[in-house]
């Protein structure tokens, strides 16, 4: 979730109390996070495609016990209550199995032990959600269905 579908690092640097060593420890920190560009539309496109059983897997902050409830509320606010039924909070992402894990880092929270393919957002291969959607939906659909279909057109239809 952090720096994958919401701007976690930006919020850390823009905190009103820059003297705090752990700004993420403040009540309300996670609720105030802004969505990443294209993330809401991208996740919804994956869900609506019917090709994937989409779950949100996020590591909680040990510095903020409220991160559990705030992350859940953030998902409800941006995606609706239905996706909250598919929210998994785990400090070790390697404990879970799946076909794909979309994350901003490749190790440190068990990503290196994830049993499927890691799609690392923010890299040359996947700089943002546009490239993830092109890969995920383009990979699964016949080329004639997506070759002239841009992400902005997809956003208009969702």
Residue ranges and their predicted role:
Residues 50, 80-85, 114-119:
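Structural alpha-beta junctions
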Residues 48, 94, 111-115:
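Short, conserved loop/helix-junction motifs that constitute active-site signature segments
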Residues 1-33:
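Active-site neighborhood of HAD-like aspartate-dependent phosphohydrolases
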Residues 58-100, 106-109:
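Substrate-recognition "cap/lid" segment bordering the active-site pocket of phosphatases
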Residues 34, 39-69, 75:
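Substrate-recognition element of Asp-dependent hydrolases with the DxDx(T/V) motif
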Residues 100-141:
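Acidic, Mg2+-coordinating phosphoryl-transfer loop and its flanking beta/alpha structural elements
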Residues 46, 54-65, 136-157:
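Membrane-proximal envelope and lipid/glycan-remodeling enzymes
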Residues 13-17, 74, 117-120:
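Glycine-rich, phosphate-binding/catalytic loops in enzymes
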